[in-house]
Amino acid sequence: MIQITVVQIDNYGPWTVTPNPRRESDLQALQSRLYCDMNLQFGAHRGLAFYTRFDNIIAITNGIDLETHKRIQNSVKNRYPFTVSMAVASAETAYEAQKLATETIQEYGSAQDDVRKEVLDVANEFVSNGYVQLAHVDINDITGKLTDLETAYDTYLSVQMTKLKLMEELKKYDSMGFFIGGDNFMCPCNGMSEKDFLCMFEDIRDSCGIDLKAGIGIGKTAEDASNLADIGLEVIREGKTDFQVYTLKQSIEERKDITYNYMCPI
């Protein structure tokens, strides 16, 4: 089981133009700061957040309880000119968990409803014995094939096209994909096998002409899984395996050493 939290800014669209449209550079900076905060605060509890659309953030929160969510929510209220609503859900796959969390928030009203404020709800249950599976995917030799040859924008366009195709393919497995900078993508993918990734990469290569590789990490928390995925990707980069997908799994002994419910540092 994987636990997902959907974070949504309350009534954000109307706020950006009240009483007049706010300066775009300020809005971009504010959105980026919120994303930074969410990663720092969930990250302090071994979680991981993805910016998606900035006014909606998706976080992997295995091991993070309701009280910690409330503390993070209060921290936003105390330091930002808006509030956020949160919904938590768990499921066998990442896509299904975010779907349940999204539906829970939607039950309280529209994202632009000035009455709906600081929702905090749980769709089903908190995960105690679940796991997180993350794939760290990147493009093979993007520097030699794109960065050093194409314009900055054309390279960016190729990366975004790859991202879209990757996200579409991952959804077929009830998984998700998020761009994390450079040519890198982090993909919550509980239930997927190495064979699934190899087949998916072949389809992407045939349609986009882009070769991908992935380190897969399986751990009790998002932090554990992402660390293992990073190591797996390095194994491929260093030529220590002939395959384009490499999986590392956290041992039971390592899982027992993890303590949850740290005090939020911010």
Curated annotation (Swiss-Prot):
Gene3D superfamilies: 3.30.70.270, Nucleotide cyclase. It catalyses: GTP + 3 H2O = 2-amino-5-formylamino-6-(5-phospho-D-ribosylamino)pyrimidin-4(3H)-one + 2 phosphate + 2 H(+). GO terms for molecular function: GTP binding; GTP cyclohydrolase IIa activity. It holds the Pfam family GCH_III. The keyword Ribonucleoprotein does not apply. It comes from the Archaea. Its EC number is 3.5.4.29. It is an enzyme of class 3 (hydrolase). GO terms for biological process: biosynthetic process. InterPro entries: GTP_CycHdrlase_3 (IPR007839), Nucleotide_cyclase (IPR029787), Rev_trsase/Diguanyl_cyclase (IPR043128). Keywords: GTP-binding, Hydrolase, Nucleotide-binding. Belongs to the archaeal-type GTP cyclohydrolase family. Catalyzes the formation of 2-amino-5-formylamino-6-ribofuranosylamino-4(3H)-pyrimidinone ribonucleotide monophosphate and inorganic phosphate from GTP. Also has an independent pyrophosphate phosphohydrolase activity. This is GTP cyclohydrolase III. It comes from Methanococcus maripaludis (strain C7 / ATCC BAA-1331). The lineage of its organism: Archaea, Methanobacteriati, Methanobacteriota, Methanomada group, Methanococci.
